[in-house]
Amino acid sequence: AVETQSGEIIGGCNVESSSYSLTCCAERTTLFRAIAEGHTSFRALAVATENGGSPCGACRQVIWDLCKEIPVHICDKKGWVKTLTSSELLPDAFDDSDLEPFNKLNV
């Protein structure tokens, strides 16, 4: 779930596909839903798994792209919680500042 700057809590879920690479994790569906509902600024993200698993690399990149520096609370069903920032999850993140403007490309 993600908490928006306005205090609204928005949830998501893991969407499985028989073609595993097309599966979309709950972190991404949560953020995509929030964006689709018009939210663009977030206070925190909570990731709940059975065993306290950390977000995958794709989710870490999307969290960084859409949230920048927010706390990410990772928890399991027994009550264990670990809080990291987006940059701790994805140090030296690749983002739009690493992209050259199109007009500078030799295309």
Feature roles, as predicted:
Residues C13-T29:
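Compact, glycine-rich, soluble single-domain proteins
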Residues C24-R43:
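Short, charged low-complexity linear segments at domain edges
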Residues A1-E8:
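Short beta-strand scaffold segments in enzyme catalytic cores
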Residues G11-G12, I74:
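General beta-strand structural signal in soluble alpha/beta enzymes
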Residues E8-I9, V81:
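Hydrophobic "anchor" residues
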Residues E37-V107:
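C-terminal binding/interaction regions
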